[in-house]
Structures are given as C-alpha cells and as structure tokens.
Amino acid sequence: MAITVQETAKIVADFQQAPNDTGSPEVQVALLSARITYLTEHFKSHAKDHHSRRGLLKLVSQRRKLLDYLKRKNADRYRTLIERLGLRK
C-alpha cells in the first residue's frame, strides 16, 4: 500500500475526535483522501492501469458515502472537514 504507517498515524492524530479514535468519519475520510491523492498521482505516470482505476473509483464512492453520512448527522463537522481537506462544496 502507498501510505506508510507513520503517515497513517499522523493523519489519525490530526483528525481524531478523542484519544484512540480511529473510526470516526473524519478520520476515515482523511485516510481515504490520502489514498485517493496517491492513486491520482500514480495515474499521471501509469495511465493504462485500469485495475487500480477501479479501486480508485471504489475509494471515491466510499468517501462520498461517508461524507453524506457526516453531512446528515452533523453539518458543522462536515463543513469543517471539507474545508480542512480542501474538498469541493
């Protein structure tokens, strides 16, 4: 996988809501965004890697579902998260 353990730990520490929080929507979306960013860079040099492109589409879909969930449950946390990650909307 592209994201190292140290990068994962840093992302979790930046977005966790409480100590030992690794499952909140914010953490999950941040980790997915990091993987999506890596794969996007990968496709700049490997344009014909269709197998990985399918994985990218699954990651984007999963992130969208988590963002929709967060928007439904707590709109303020949703807005804060998309600002921190620099996502559209």
UniProtKB/Swiss-Prot annotation:
Keyword Nucleus: no
Alphabetical list of CDD domains matching this protein: Ribosomal_S15p_S13e
Gene Ontology annotations for the cellular component aspect, listed alphabetically: cytosolic small ribosomal subunit
UniProt-recorded Gene Ontology molecular function terms: rRNA binding; structural constituent of ribosome
Keywords attached to this entry: Ribonucleoprotein, Ribosomal protein, RNA-binding, rRNA-binding
Protein's name according to its UniProt entry: Small ribosomal subunit protein uS15
HAMAP family: Ribosomal_uS15_B
Transmembrane segment boundaries: none
Disulfide pattern: none
Subunit note: Part of the 30S ribosomal subunit. Forms a bridge to the 50S subunit in the 70S ribosome, contacting the 23S rRNA.
SUPFAM superfamilies (UniProt xref): S15/NS1 RNA-binding domain
Family of this protein: Belongs to the universal ribosomal protein uS15 family.
Gene (UniProt): rpsO
Summary of the function given for this chain in its UniProt record: One of the primary rRNA binding proteins, it binds directly to 16S rRNA where it helps nucleate assembly of the platform of the 30S subunit by binding and bridging several RNA helices of the 16S rRNA. Forms an intersubunit bridge (bridge B4) with the 23S rRNA of the 50S subunit in the ribosome.
Matching Pfam families: Ribosomal_S15
SMART domains: Ribosomal_S15
